[in-house]
């Protein structure tokens, strides 16, 4: 019975969030079980372009370090904000969500050529947090019961938290920068006088990921919507 409940809950996670989170967990599990090593996964331009180890373009986004506090913290944020985006502003737009993944991953890989980062998964999570926070500007947040602020400040609060823990803020800055570029090109620039939509999801992605339009006369049975994580007043991060 418990297995069926867990399976049902897992299958209710929207597809992109489910696939990415699962890939991250399985990759970390494989490293933990010593089936593979981080040296086979990290971002290395020379190995990618000279030795054709193309898989590193993907695997460097899937490993968040050994199982521990940092891994759990990153997985919680990745799952929550990826799912909230997919169930919120990208609801019914799976192809657009996949295109955001590809665009963000491409930019981070490009910037990764100039900074000494070997794993980009955490920066990718910050990008997701940034886009969600800018699209939900009036949501009130509470950080460990210490700070109250509106959602757009969340990426900067997380960067300050990283700084307090003695971590490099390059990862956070990269995620914020890529998130802002996407948000500007997708949400701001097209709505400016003379602005145009630069980011256009390729039709092949729509063919693969978007379901055909339903018959407008079809009246489906009501179904329970999967529970999201729409944090509002009084909701604590990490608590």
UniProtKB/Swiss-Prot annotation:
GO biological process: endoplasmic reticulum unfolded protein response; ERAD pathway; negative regulation of retrograde protein transport, ER to cytosol; positive regulation of cell growth; positive regulation of cell population proliferation; retrograde protein transport, ER to cytosol; suckling behavior
Keyword Mitochondrion included in the entry's annotation: no
Cytoplasmic topological domain residue ranges: 1-57, 118-150, 194-239
Induction: Up-regulated in response to endoplasmic reticulum stress via the ERN1-XBP1 pathway of the unfolded protein response (UPR).
Stored Pfam families: DER1 (PF04511)
GO molecular function, one term: signal recognition particle binding
Lumenal side: 79-96, 172
Membrane topology: Multi-pass membrane protein
Region (Disordered): 214-239
Transmembrane segment boundaries: 58-78, 97-117, 151-171, 173-193
GO cellular component terms given for this protein: early endosome; endoplasmic reticulum; endoplasmic reticulum membrane; late endosome
UniProtKB keywords: Endoplasmic reticulum, Membrane, Transmembrane, Transmembrane helix, Unfolded protein response
Protein localization: Endoplasmic reticulum membrane
Range of residues in the leader sequence: none
Biased composition (Gly residues): 229-239
Tissues of expression: Widely expressed, with lowest levels in brain and heart.
Function comment: Functional component of endoplasmic reticulum-associated degradation (ERAD) for misfolded lumenal glycoproteins, but not that of misfolded nonglycoproteins. May act by forming a channel that allows the retrotranslocation of misfolded glycoproteins into the cytosol where they are ubiquitinated and degraded by the proteasome. May mediate the interaction between VCP and misfolded glycoproteins.
Oligomeric form and interacting partners: Forms homo- and heterooligomers with DERL3 and, to a lesser extent, with DERL1. Interacts with the SEL1L/SYVN1 and VCP/SELENOS protein complexes. Mediates association between VCP and EDEM1, as well as that between VCP and the misfolded glycoproteins. Interacts with OS9. Interacts with SELENOK and SELENOS. Interacts with the signal recognition particle/SRP and the SRP receptor; in the process of endoplasmic reticulum stress-induced pre-emptive quality control. Interacts with CCDC47.
Protein name (record): Derlin-2
The species this protein was found in: Mus musculus (Mouse)
Gene: Derl2
């Amino acid at each position: 019975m418990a297995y069926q409940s867990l399976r049902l809950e897992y299958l209710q996670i929207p597809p992109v969030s489910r696939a990415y989170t699962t890939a991250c967990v399985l990759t970390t599990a494989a490293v933990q079980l010593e089936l593979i090593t981080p040296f086979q996964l990290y971002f290395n331009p020379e190995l990618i372009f000279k030795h054709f180890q193309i898989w590193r373009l993907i695997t460097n986004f899937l490993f968040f370090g050994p199982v521990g506090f940092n891994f759990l913290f990153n997985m919680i944020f990745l799952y929550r904000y990826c799912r909230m985006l997919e169930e919120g502003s990208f609801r019914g737009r799976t192809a657009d969500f996949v295109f955001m993944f590809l665009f963000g991953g491409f930019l981070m890989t490009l910037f990764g050529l100039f900074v000494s980062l070997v794993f980009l998964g955490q920066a990718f999570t910050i990008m997701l947090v940034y886009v969600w926070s800018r699209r939900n500007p009036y949501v009130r947040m509470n950080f460990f019961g210490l700070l109250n602020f509106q959602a757009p400040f969340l990426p900067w609060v997380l960067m300050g938290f990283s700084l307090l823990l003695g971590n490099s803020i390059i990862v956070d800055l990269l995620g914020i920068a890529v998130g802002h570029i996407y948000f500007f090109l997708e949400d701001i620039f097209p709505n400016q006088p003379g602005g145009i939509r630069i980011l256009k999801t390729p039709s092949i992605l729509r063919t693969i990921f978007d379901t055909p339009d339903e018959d407008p006369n079809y009246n489906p049975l009501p179904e329970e919507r999967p529970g999201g994580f729409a944090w509002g007043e009084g909701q604590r991060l990490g608590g």
